[in-house]
């Protein structure tokens, strides 16, 4: 992000999305927000009350007629003077309004995430809440929305702040024992009690990290891979799951050469299903590449659906992979073996067994995700810093042969790592990465 550290500029951007639209919302934030009202020949409206006005250029020409809202500092999203202009969502209208604002001294178009970054800088939110807002905007399923809302509501911040305060309090006891060991009002040897408290905290953080694996699955989605020999019905199954023709279906073996992926919403959980090249020996260079990609995707899968044509001879061979594998018998309408090898029998021609398979996929996804707690680490950044926190706590607990001064320093570092998650300490180098994930206007 360019030079915005001082926040002397007043920023503006279209916040309401793609044009044309019924209504377009332009957001403004910064010290010259009041000057903007003066420039468009309008009085500043009563705070947080919608006012109808005519938006004008600097020479007095009418641009549009619409609503405006004014939010004076510090009681605004960014903590600065803010305004919203609600105009008709025509492209020419919005472009003219943005051009007028861009001509004003000290005003410029906002960069991606800059409104939220200013809110963070002004203490209106911490980094976990900002990340939760980014996830809320990106959420495509109900489960993702719920998870993002939990984070954006401040549940993570509350938990991490509590843990950090416990570390600070424990460190204070140790330093009190160091500095005032001869004073009568300092309990004798409180350190044993402190180590017990730290051990309990360590176990809490470990449990918290474990819950983050499920949250990551919900945020990033589960991955299901369809494999099998050529003409086993893989593409037909993918088309059924997608509800449209995604893959080409042909009697010619080896039609699918590359990976084809569709995204499903199963009970609010995002599930990515990938169709792969048929697994067989081949002299085709292109087909070999497709088969290698299929094997690579299998290695990353949460679930593998191994398909085999039931109308032919039973010859189930499943490659050794870590993911759970379901054996699916296809083309059930053509008869053939009713072998107990198959977990499910399906026919994309008659629809037999397909709804049962879809229900099973949803049940699998729900079991994988489980019950998401109120506060969970949703990003790898959180987990890395939580693990660093545990490492410092372990050093403090296990350092029986070390001076108390060094063990107190381990506790200080542990609290610092927790502070980095919320942005309370030393996070300048990651701010650009976090806020660049937002769209312009947020």
UniProtKB/Swiss-Prot annotation:
Binding residues for GTP: 231-236, 250-256, 275-278
Major localisation: cytoplasm
GO biological process: tRNA methylation; tRNA wobble uridine modification
Lineage: Bacteria, Pseudomonadati, Pseudomonadota, Alphaproteobacteria, Hyphomicrobiales
EC number: 3.6.-.-
This protein's name: tRNA modification GTPase MnmE
Domain TrmE-type G, first and last residues per copy: 221-366
Role of this protein: Exhibits a very high intrinsic GTPase hydrolysis rate. Involved in the addition of a carboxymethylaminomethyl (cmnm) group at the wobble position (U34) of certain tRNAs, forming tRNA-cmnm(5)s(2)U34.
Subcellular location: Cytoplasm
Entry keywords, A to Z: Cytoplasm, GTP-binding, Hydrolase, Magnesium, Metal-binding, Nucleotide-binding, Potassium, tRNA processing
One GO CC term, this protein: cytoplasm
